[in-house]
Amino acid sequence: MVSESQDTLTKVLAYVDSPFKLFALILMAVLAFGGYLVYDHRDLIVGTYKEHQKLPQIAEGRVDDAATHLFKHTNAQVVAIFKVNPLIGTRVLYRAYSKEGRDKSVEGLDVGLFTNNAANNKDVVALMANEIPCGEYKSAQSEVGLWYIEKGMTFGCRISVPPDHSRFIGQITVGWAEQPTNLEHTKTMLQIASTILAKEKK
C-alpha cells in the first residue's frame, strides 16, 4: 500500500517538470476541493437560497414616494434606503437621495449588517427590536457614511422596514444638518415612510 502511494507520488512529481504544469496541478486541486465543498454543503446552500426566496421585499415602486415624504415632512438633508437580508448579513444601499436629488454614485454598496463598529452594531440590534435609534453623526462608519458627511449630515435616525420586529427586510437612514426640533414628530414620519416601503400600491 505504501509502495503504491510512493509510486503514484513519483509519477506526479515526474509529470510536474515545468512551472506551467505545477500551476495547472495546483489549479485542478483547488477546483476539485471547491467542488467537493459545494457538493458536501449542497443542502445548506439550497436551504439558504429557499429561505432567501421566502423573505418579503421592500416595495421598490414606492421608494421615491417614501423619500419625497421624508424630505417634505422632516426637512431631511439625506435619505438612504437599504435592502437588508439578515440571513446572509447583507445591507445594500438601494437608493440614495440628497436635497439635490438621487445620487447613483453610492448605490449598490453593501455596508454589511454587523460590522467591527460597535456603534453600528448597537443600532442594528435596536432596529431589530423595532426601535428608532437617533444621534449625532460625527464620523463615518462606512463608505456610505463618508457620503452622508459630504452631504452635510451631522445628526441621523434609522428605522427598519417594515416597522415590525418580526421582519427586517430594509432600513431607512435619514440625516439632517442639525438635530430636528421635534424628534417625536420626526420619528412618526419615519414610521410612515417605513410603512410606505412595506407594501406596494394596489
Enumerate the predicted regions with their spans.
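Short, solvent-exposed loop/turn segments that connect beta-strands within catalytic domains
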Residues: 87-92, 102-108, 164-168
